[in-house]
Amino acid sequence: MSGLEAIWWRERPGPLGALAGAPLLLAEAPFRAAAALRGALYDRGVLPAVRAGAPVVSIGNLAVGGAGKTPAALAVAARLAGRGRRVAILSRGYGAARADARVASDGAGALLPAAEAGDEPALLARRLPGVAVLCGPRRAELARTAVEALGADALVLDDGFQHRALARDLDVVVLDASNPFGNGHLLPRGPNREPRTALRRAGLVWLSHADRAAPERLEALRALARDATGRAPVESRHAATALLDGALREAGSLEALRGRRVAALSGLARPAGFLRTLEALGAEVALARAFPDHHRFTAGELEAVLRDGDAAGCAWVVTTEKDAVRLDPALAAGAAGRLRVVRVDAELLRGADVLEAALDAALAAAAPQPRPAPRAPVS
């Protein structure tokens, strides 16, 4: 975590932290004004929101990075597919070398590597083989391609809360219950893209990492969610569900990590959560190498971590599935026996019924309305 991010996520920065962040206060004011103006233009219809021709469920958040949107998007897409829907996920494709519109998966299998699609689309395509994944900055264009070319009849807009150019039928906002707003400021003074009052646009709040939140904070967030949306929130925890090797093949039970000395490799917005997951699985983390979010690992970086892990007596270098898809496949396959990958999913603790009801309402709202029968002519 960089020095700036440390300032962002420290909820009580103290005098030194406040002093270090003071110069950014001048930049926060114009960002706040620009965000408010943009929101008002969408609210009043001056800036239009395009209808996709299919129900749209947006998964987003208020802060930058690390809230748990990807597991939530996986869960929502899987639930829609389980209802028989032809689902397509629309993603910005952060970390990709290309910025044009592209199809990462057509629903029959992955078509692009992470270097071209971005790590999150590549992961989503791998985890949801029956779901199409499209990526690019213009999500309305992606939606049109998904509906017209791929036959999608339900769309999941990944990281879409601020992307208001595409109309949606349900806005799901994911908050990290353990630290939802950081220092409370907007960019660049803090991590938030919008103030918490923007939650009034949401249809559902999803509290990730609810198991790590203090009881009094959890109650306050539940009240905030109900006040903003009229619904109780969904609550989840990040649960490790599988252990893979460097080639992303099953590699036995997660119990294999218990008591093992390991090196942790990650390129995440908030790597501390990954370290906590490893410790909860009983692993002894002898060293940790954290790179910036969406970082594409080079051969030299991977070799250095493997070498340092060997020197520290580590059985394996362990990384996340989101990081593993960014590794060069040939490099990862060559080091498959020395790498382990922990798969993490969102395990719902509360609110599964609330989520299902919200999806029901979104699908019903987007359903074509029958035309009234023509009136009989008056004789």
Swiss-Prot record:
Sequence positions that bind ATP: A63, V64, G65, G66, A67, G68, K69, T70
Gene3D superfamilies attached to this UniProt entry: P-loop containing nucleotide triphosphate hydrolases
Pfam families attached to this UniProt entry: LpxK (PF02606)
Pathway info: Glycolipid biosynthesis; lipid IV(A) biosynthesis; lipid IV(A) from (3R)-3-hydroxytetradecanoyl-[acyl-carrier-protein] and UDP-N-acetyl-alpha-D-glucosamine: step 6/6
InterPro entries in alphabetical order: LpxK, P-loop_NTPase
EC code: 2.7.1.130
GO BP field: lipid A biosynthetic process; lipopolysaccharide core region biosynthetic process
Superkingdom of this protein's organism: Bacteria
Molecular function in Gene Ontology: ATP binding; tetraacyldisaccharide 4'-kinase activity
Reaction catalysis annotation: a lipid A disaccharide + ATP = a lipid IVA + ADP + H(+)
GO cellular component: plasma membrane
Enzyme class per UniProt: transferase
Keywords for this protein: ATP-binding, Kinase, Lipid A biosynthesis, Lipid biosynthesis, Lipid metabolism, Nucleotide-binding, Transferase
Family, as annotated: Belongs to the LpxK family.
Function description: Transfers the gamma-phosphate of ATP to the 4'-position of a tetraacyldisaccharide 1-phosphate intermediate (termed DS-1-P) to form tetraacyldisaccharide 1,4'-bis-phosphate (lipid IVA).
Name of the molecule in the record: Tetraacyldisaccharide 4'-kinase
Lineage: Bacteria, Pseudomonadati, Myxococcota, Myxococcia, Myxococcales
